[in-house]
Amino acid sequence: MTDDSLKIGNGLPLVGPGTDVGISSLPMLGYLGKNYASAKVTTDGHCPACRAKGKLSALKPYRISFQESVFLCEDLQCIYPLGSESLTNLISPDSEDCPTPSKPQKRKRLETNCRNSPLPVHSKKTRSHIVTDSEPIVNGKYNGEVCDDFSASFPDTSAHQDPASTAASVEQSEALEADDVVVAATEDPATVSVTSELEMPAKSRCLPLCQTLCVQWKNTQALCWLDCILSALVHLEVLRKTVLEACSREECVFGRLFEMYHQADELLHTHHLHGVTGEDCKKLTSEIFTEIDTCLNKVRDEIFAKLQPKLRCTLGDMESPVFALPVLLKLEPHVESLFTYSFSWNFECSHCGHQYQNRCVKSLVTFTNIVPEWHPLNAAHFGPCNSCNSKSQIRKMVLERASPILMLHFVEGLPRRDLQHYAFHFEGSLYQVTSVIQYQANNHFITWFLDADGSWLECDDLKGPCAKRHVTCEVPASETHIVIWERKSQVPIEEAACLPCMKPNVQPVSGEEQPTCPALCSLAGTATSEPSVAHPTSMAGAPQTLPEIQAVAHGDSVLSGAKGMVDSILPSALEETIQETASVSQVDSKDCLLEDKPVAGSAALVRVLAFQPQDSPGSSGSSLVSSLCEGKLVAPCVDSSFPSQAVSTDLQAVLSQAGDTVVPNPVTDAPVPVLVQELKSLATEKDSQTQLLPLKTEKLDPEQPGKSQASNLRKRETTASSKTVAARSAQNQPRKEDQKRAFVGSWVKGLLSRGGAFMPTCVLSQSRAVSDLQPSVKGASNFDGFKTKSISRRSKRMSRKAKHMEELSPRNSSPPLSWTAALTQAAENATSALLREQEGSRPAPLRHRSPGNESAISPASRGDAAEDQVHKLRLKLLKKLKAKKKKLAALISSPHREPSLSDHSEPASHCGTPASDQSEPVSHCGSPNDCESIEDLLKELQHQIDLADSKSGCTSAPDATSNNSQSHEEILAELLSPTAMSEPSESGELELRYLEMGDSTPAQAPSEFSVVSLNTCLKQDHDYCSPEKGQREVDLHSVMDSACIRTLNLGSPMKTDIFDDFFSTSALNSLTNDTLDIPHFDDSLFENC
C-alpha cells in the first residue's frame, strides 16, 4: 500500500483502516462519525456524571474533523462534558495508528522533542493525554522517576528507565502543571493511545501529582496476609467515616490504624509538594520513606499482637485473611456491625426432596463450587445433600439484611472478571465492588481497591512503599479471593435500570403487596403479604409450611379440597365458640377472583377458614355464609362446570355445626346428576379420609332448596355424649359390614329386576323404583344370613326405612329435618355401590322428629325396651319356624298324609298389644294352626316395630306415608336369616311360584278359599294382579307321590339367575343331595316385596 492509495481526490488522507479488499469500514454513530480506536480510550468507559447518579453510561467519541474527535456521554439527557471544561480541552487529536502521510517527519521530530525538551504550553500536543499501560504518571505508578535518589526505593521499575528520560519527565511535569495539563512521555510510540481528559473528574485532573499516590505496607516476615487486610480497611470510605466520628484513636484499634496511616500519607504528600514548589527533589530521600515505614509498621505490630492470641499465629508463618479478618473485626463490636449481614441458606434436594432453611448472621461467607451465573442476588452454589448424599445439588444464599460493607469469600474465584457485573441494588441502595483481595498460587495476597476517579490501585507489599494505579482491575477471575462491596448513597431504582435492582424472595421496602400466592394473600384480607420461604419466622397468617400448602393446593379434584376443608375445620369448630369461627366473615370475597382455579381456590379457602385470626370476636358467621350462598366466594374458586352450591352447601353444614345458625340453602335452577355421581365416585376412592367424618359431601341436594341442614346438626349436639360416641363408633366399623345386604331383599329385588319377562306389569311398575333405590348385590360375601343380630343392623334398617319413606314423599312437600335423608334425583340413578357407601356413612342413631317436637328427645330406655320387645317376638317366631320345619320333615316322610286345611287361630298376646287389621294369607303346608300362629306372630312383630318407632320419635315427616313393603322386606330378612338355606314356596301351580327356590318340597293343590283369599288381599292392599289362568283339578295323591322324586331343576335360566343371586356353587351342590335342609316358607310372605 503506497501513500497515494490513502488519499482522496482533494489530497486529504483517508480516515479508517483503508479501502483494501477484506477491510471493512467501521459503522458511523450519528452524523459526526465514530472514532475507530474508542476501545483504548477510557479507563472504565463510563460517564462520571451519570455514575454519580447511579447510572452507567458510556463515553463515546464523535468525529468533528478528519483529525479530531470529542468524547460525549451516550445518554441523551446528559451533556457531560459540555459546560464543565473549555472546548479546547475537550477536543482530542487523531491517534497515531492512523498514519498521516503528508506529515510523517514532523510527528517524529515532535516525539523526539518531547523527550529532550519541554513542550510549548500552548501546543496542540498539550491538549492530549498520551498514556501506555506501563506509564508511570497517568497510571498512578510513582516508580521513582522524580529524582535519582528516590528511584532507589523502587527496584521493580527503575531498571526500565534511564536517567536522561527521567529528568526530562520531571521537566515536562513542571511545565504541564502550570497549564493544569498532565502530559507524559513514552519510549514506545507504537503502543501509544489517545485518552481524553474527560475520563477523570475535574477534581482529579486539577490535583497535583502527589495526591494520586498512596502509601502501603512493605512485606516483612511473610505478613502479606495482614498487609492486604490493612490496605483494604484503610480505603473503605464507610469504615473511615465511622471510625473518625465514633472511635477514640487512643483506645480503638481501628482509630489507631487510621491515625497512623493518615500520618504516613501526610509525610509523602508534604515532601512531594515541597519538591513541586521549586525545592530540590532530592528532599524526597529514603529517610522520608523510612519514617513512613515506621508509622505503618508500628500500627501493624500492634494489630498483630492483638490477633496473635486468637489466631495462634507467629511471625514468618503464613496465615489466611479469611480467618484473620473476622477475628480483627470482633475486636470492635461497633465496627463489626458495619460488616455483619443476615441471610438464609435455602436448600432443596431435587433427588430426595430433602430441604432446609438456615438463617445466619455473619461478616464473611465462603462460597465454593458456585454456579456459572452467580450474582449477589443469585448467590447459589453446588453442594451435596445431607440426606441422600446426592451431588451437584444447589444451595442458595438469600440476603435478608445487607450491611453497609458486604464481604464474600470465593474458594475457586468468580466466574467473570468484570467486577461491574456484580454491582447490585438492595433495599434502594447501590452496592458496588470497591475492594478485591487477590490470591496468587505462591501463597501471596494482593489488595486492589477502586479509587474515586474510577481507576484501580494495586497494593502489593512486594512492589515498594506506594500503590500502583491501573485503569482496570487486572485480577484474573480465578484468583479473586475476597470481594468487598460498599453501599453507596440512596439511588432511585428507576434511574439505575442498567443494574439489577430487584431483590428476589424478599419483602418490598415500600410496603407494596407482592404476594407469592395470590389466592391466599387476597383471601387473607390483610395489608401484609406472604413472605418468601426465606422468612419462616415472620410469616403473616397461617404458620403453615410450604410442603403443607402444596399438599393442599395440588389436590386431584374439587372434592379433595372440600374434604380437606372439613378435615381442618371440623375438630376446631366443635370445640371453639361461635365468636372464634365467626371472624371468617371478614373475608373479602371478591379477591378470590385473582386465581380462577378449582383446586387452588378451595385450598386457599381452607387456609383462610382454618387460620383466620380473631379480629372481631363479636361478629357473626352469617355474613360469610350469605356470601357463600350468593356464590361470591366459592364460585370463582371452583371450576365453572361445578355448581357453586355444591361447595357452599357443605360449608353451610360445617358452619351451622360450629355455631347455632340456621342457614337457608341457595336455590339451583337445574339439577346436575352427573356431577353428583362424580362426587360420590371420588368419595368412594377417598373412603379412608372420610370414615371418621359425620359430614359427607355426597349428600348434596341441589334440588331441594328448603331443606335445612343445620337443625338436625344442632339437635345432635344436644344429645347425650354416650350416644354420640356410640354412633361414631358404629360408623367406624369395617366397610364389609355396611356392604352386606339382607338376603331376602337382595334376592327378591334381583328376581324382580332380572325376571321382568314373566312378571305382571303392575309388579314391574312397582318394583322399578325399588330396584333403582336398592339394586341387587351378587356374591356369597354379601350374604349375611348367618350374621349375628346387633344394634348397628337395626339402626341401619331404621335409617334405610326412613330413606325409603323420604323417597316416596312428594317433592313439593315440607322438608324433613335431617340432612341425612336428603337424596337427590341424581342420587337415585347412581350405582348400587355408591348407594351402599352413602348408607354406610350415615350416623346410626339418628332419629326423625316432627317439626313441632324438635326439642323433645326420647329417652334411651324407651327405645331399648321397644327393641327388646321386637326381639322377643322374633325369637318366638323362630321357634315356630323350627317347629314347622320339623313337621315339614314329617310330612315329606309320610306323603300320603292329608294335611288339615281347617282354620285355627292362635291369639298373639305376647305383649298385650292388639294385632293389626291387615290380613295375611294362610299357608298351606304343615298344620293350619302353625300357619296361623306364624301369621299372627308376623302381624304382632310388625305392630311392635311400628309402635317402637312411634314411641321413640322415629316417625317420618308429616307428608311421608308409611310403606309396609319396606318393613315387610326387612322383617323377612331378619326372620329368615338364621335358616340354613332357602325356603321354597309350596304353591300348586308353577306359574304362581314367583319365589320358588326349588322343587324338592311337596306341593299341595290350593283350595278355592285360599286362592280367592290370596288374590283378594293382594288386589286390595297393593294392587297386585296375578296372571289369569284356567281352573284345573289336580289329584292331590299324584302330586304328593311325585313330590318325593323331584329334584332341583337348574335348566331354566330364570331359576339359574335366582340361585346365582342367593347360593354359591357349593351350596347348590349340597341342596341336590340333602332335601331336608331346605325349610319351607309361605310364598305369600313376599306379596309386598
UniProtKB/Swiss-Prot annotation:
Entry's Gene Ontology cellular component terms: Cajal body
Assembly and interaction partners: Interacts with ELL.
Compositional bias annotation for Basic and acidic residues: 895-907
Region listing for SUMO-binding, in residue ranges: 224-483
Any GO BP annotation: protein desumoylation
Main location: nucleus
Modified residues (Phosphoserine): S894
GO MF annotations in UniProt: deSUMOylase activity; SUMO binding
Subcellular location: Nucleus, Cajal body
Polar residues: bias regions: 719-733
Domain of life from the UniProt record: Eukaryota
Cross-referenced Pfam families: DUF4650 (PF15509), Peptidase_C98 (PF15499)
Compositional bias segments (type: Basic residues): 791-803
Alphabetic keyword roster: Hydrolase, Nucleus, Phosphoprotein, Protease, Thiol protease
Naturally occurring in which organism (per UniProt): Mus musculus (Mouse)
Name of the encoding gene: Uspl1
USP domain: residues covered: 215-488
Record-given protein name: SUMO-specific isopeptidase USPL1
Leader sequence residues: none
EC annotation from Swiss-Prot or TrEMBL: 3.4.22.-
Role summary: SUMO-specific isopeptidase involved in protein desumoylation. Specifically binds SUMO proteins with a higher affinity for SUMO2 and SUMO3 which it cleaves more efficiently. Also able to process full-length SUMO proteins to their mature forms. Plays a key role in RNA polymerase-II-mediated snRNA transcription in the Cajal bodies. Is a component of complexes that can bind to U snRNA genes.
Similarity annotation: Belongs to the peptidase C19 family.
Region (Disordered): 90-128, 687-739, 791-817, 835-868, 891-928
